[in-house]
Amino acid sequence: QVVTQMMMKAIDEINANAEGIHVTGYPNGVLGGSSDLVEGVQEGMVDIITEGPAQFASWIPKAAQVEAPYLWQSVEHMQKALNGEYKDTLNELFQQVDVRIMGSFYYGTRQLTTNKTVSTLADLKGMKIRVPQSDLYIKMVEAWGASATPMNINELYMALQTGTVDGQENPLTTFQSYKFYEVVKNVTLTNHIICPNMVFMNGDVWNGLSDHDKEVVQTAINNAITWQDEQIITAEQSLASELEGLGVTIITPDDTIREATVPYIKPSIEDWDYIQTLA
């Protein structure tokens, strides 16, 4: 996982330069699933996490907006907004739960992968699609006429293999790294979410750092995010053809999936029009 490598790079840089702290990393779900992590960072049980902001929607409903389907026009649009003025807007909200956004990074563009060919909206009817534990993602799959199954990603390979779910949606880098191509052989290039993830830090822990260590931590995270974004953008340029070499069928769908999704989702995204002005 590139995200794990990103955070280990940040940790190494912090530990090489900080004066009053030492950071230990726990990758690959060792500290629990998404719900455990987002609760843990609020309560101070975990100091720093990477997560999709939609995972905080139970406490900050507006946090889910930045993962809305078809919201971002490009990766550059997302980066400009979330590392610019919209970051300040979000940080004000996250202060309410004692969490600080340290930075946003490009997780990848989410695509649909299934156990049968999907090239149009009608093909999705009745299918069981795994999603993250997020109302926004559940609503998106409802717009497709499919059934959403929230599930921890570490349980997903087996669920795909046994047919508990018919498909899932994630960036191709995730599809590859978790080897989901071994159990589902169809990728539909829906490009439905240009997906940000964020590095979050417990507010009390941040406030307890010296000025020197604050600068070290923020610089290390910024450097790691720059590396991560470059890695994902480069990998995505060749991944479709690499997956074809592994026996995966790559499908370009018609416009019916997008046309069903945007009108269903957009009314619930308060800042949709404002975010478009940040491109």
Where are these regions (language model features)?
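N-terminal secretory/targeting leader peptides
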Residues: 1-76, 85-86, 94-279
